Regions:
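Residue at a conserved register position within TPR or TPR-like alpha-solenoid repeats
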Residues: 15, 50, 91, 133, ...
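Helix-turn-helix DNA-binding segment
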Residues: 422-468
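Short coil/turn linking the two alpha-helices of tandem helical-hairpin repeats
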Residues: 115, 197, 279, 300, ...
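Tetratricopeptide repeat
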Residues: 24, 31, 59, 65-66, ...
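Inter-helical turn/loop elements of alpha-helical hairpins
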Residues: 1-71, 90-102, 133-140, 144, ...
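TPR/Sel1-like alpha-solenoid repeat signature
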Residues: 62, 126-133, 145, 162-173, ...
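Alpha-solenoid helical repeat architecture
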Residues: 2-6, 34-45, 73-86, 113-128, ...
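General nucleic-acid-binding
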Residues: 352-419
């Protein structure tokens, strides 16, 4: 990834994108043979080889070695640039988001104006920062990263640079709620990756995630879950753990939406067990917390929700859950709804639906808001969001009848399907808010303790336990 000679940097970057670690090491040895003084260059290429192999433990050890070796030498600044780049990838892979900020800030501060590595590495770092920003719903930062990428003066027009820019562009469009456009960019980027053999560290996991979210937004749940499974497989293979847990959470949510709460909480429990078994430090515990929060809100477990809300980052869903718990407690303020942001399509549709629900007793007002929301849904592909507004189905149907189009008639059909699905769930005794005793049982089930032990602890018979289940 480092270019000892200016003409070689594109070739070296392709080696890195294609996981050709042996060739990187051989190139480093060739550099050393041509010029025995270029020890630092050879060592950095060896570090990058560890990195593109996704051997992050080996890469971290190599970072320590070469930082120690070249401290207080003429090569120290160059080595520091290379190791901060490496640590950015390592910290992201391990989900160390706090340390990731430190390594990225150092790299950007020391390489933005006078890069010590070639400029493609600058875009690489920005892509990592964009991925972290998307995971944490830091959408303003994500947008500024993309702006910096497209304004950055690069020295060549190679496909791998376009690939980096497209990765972030797709994420930005998704953050805006422009799922149709985001999916188009992500699909093209996936094709670039296939055509050029980009794997390992540069695998198109972020673009696949955008495609999965776009499918989910379009109410294509089966397609979305298939992509999420592919992401989990690829993330495991290349040790990209944030992506694994982000994708896994949607399996839990899918079970929860089907009222399969035991299965949903079992996935959350397995996530926590997997994280606890890692032999490296990380900042990923918030992901199963978020996944559990989603399950808890469906059963109105306000007490457990509050515990989770107190310890998770302030993601978009977290803000929505806080507002929901206030509503359940009888706190409804029109000021809160009217002050909701509405710059992007994602923000606009959420605000319109929220206002439609607030004015549900004033039907004509609610229908007008919902009609506007449906127009945005058609253009952006935010179908599933509308289909999950169970309390507003009557308002949605009246909005559809206001001015039926092909899309709105399609939405009417999907609403009817959801009503039938909900009726089927109700015939099975779901979804009814759980009693306090049932909630207590569910809380214990999420800990992984055997049912017999829970029965004994709560002084509940096994038959009663089965009834609660």
């Amino acid at each position: 990834m480092y270019h000892p000679y200016a003409m070689a940097h594109v070739e070296l970057r392709e080696m890195a994108f294609q996981m050709r670690s042996a060739e990187l090491r051989n190139y480093g040895q060739d550099v050393l043979k041509r010029d025995p003084k270029r020890v630092a260059a050879a060592e950095v290429l060896d570090l990058m080889a560890y990195l593109v192999e996704c051997d992050f433990v080996g890469a971290e050890a190599k970072v320590d070695t070469i930082k120690f070796r070249f401290k207080n030498t003429s090569d120290e600044a160059y080595v520091d640039a290379a190791t901060s780049l490496a640590m950015s990838h390592i910290n992201f892979a391990f989900g160390r988001f706090k340390e990731l900020d430190i390594s990225i800030d150092y790299f950007l501060a020391n390489n933005r104006a006078l890069p010590k590595l070639e400029k493609g590495e600058f875009l690489d770092i920005l892509r990592i920062l964009a991925q972290k920003s998307m995971i944490l719903d830091q959408f303003d930062r994500l947008e500024s990263i993309y702006k910096e990428m497209i304004e950055y003066e690069i020295e060549d027009q190679s496909p791998n640079l376009l690939y980096l820019v497209n990765s972030v562009h797709a994420m930005v469009l998704m953050s805006h709620g422009e799922f149709i456009k985001a999916n188009e960019v992500a699909r093209r980027n996936l094709e670039i990756a296939k055509q050029h053999g980009y794997i390992g560290l540069m695998a198109p996991i972020d673009s696949m995630y955008v495609m999965a979210r776009a499918a989910l937004a379009g109410a294509k749940n089966k397609e979305a879950l298939e992509i999420f499974d592919q992401i989990k497989e690829m993330a495991t293979k290349y040790s990209q753990w944030p992506w694994y847990f982000m994708a896994d959470g949607y399996s839990s949510r899918e079970h929860a939406l089907k009222n399969e709460m035991t299965e949903a909480l079992a996935i959350v429990r397995e996530e926590r067990e997997k994280l606890a078994a890692f032999n490296f430090k990380h900042d990923l515990n918030f992901i199963p917390d978020i996944n559990e929060l989603y399950v808890r809100h469906l059963i109105k477990d306000i007490e457990r929700m509050q515990t989770l809300l107190d310890r998770v980052p302030n993601l978009i869903m977290v803000q929505q859950m806080r507002a929901l718990t206030e509503e359940w407690r009888g706190v409804q303020k029109i000021d809160w709804y009217e002050k909701l942001p509405d710059r992007t399509p994602r923000e606009k549709i959420y605000k319109l639906v929220a206002l439609a629900e607030f004015y549900i007793d004033k039907e004509s007002v609610a229908v007008d808001y919902m009609f506007q929301a449906l127009q945005i849904a058609e253009v952006t592909g935010q179908v599933e969001f509308i289909l999950r507004q169970y309390r507003l189905f009557d308002i949605i149907q009246k909005a559809i009848a206001k001015k039926p189009t092909v899309f709105l008639e399609y939405m009417g059909t999907r609403i009817a399907e959801r009503i039938n699905q909900n009726n089927e769930k109700n015939r099975k005794g779901l979804p009814v808010p759980l009693t306090n005793r049932e909630l207590e049982v569910v809380r214990h089930l999420s800990t992984g303790i055997p049912i017999s032990a829970i029965s004994s602890s709560l002084h509940v018979s096994m038959n009663t336990m089965k009834t609660h289940l």
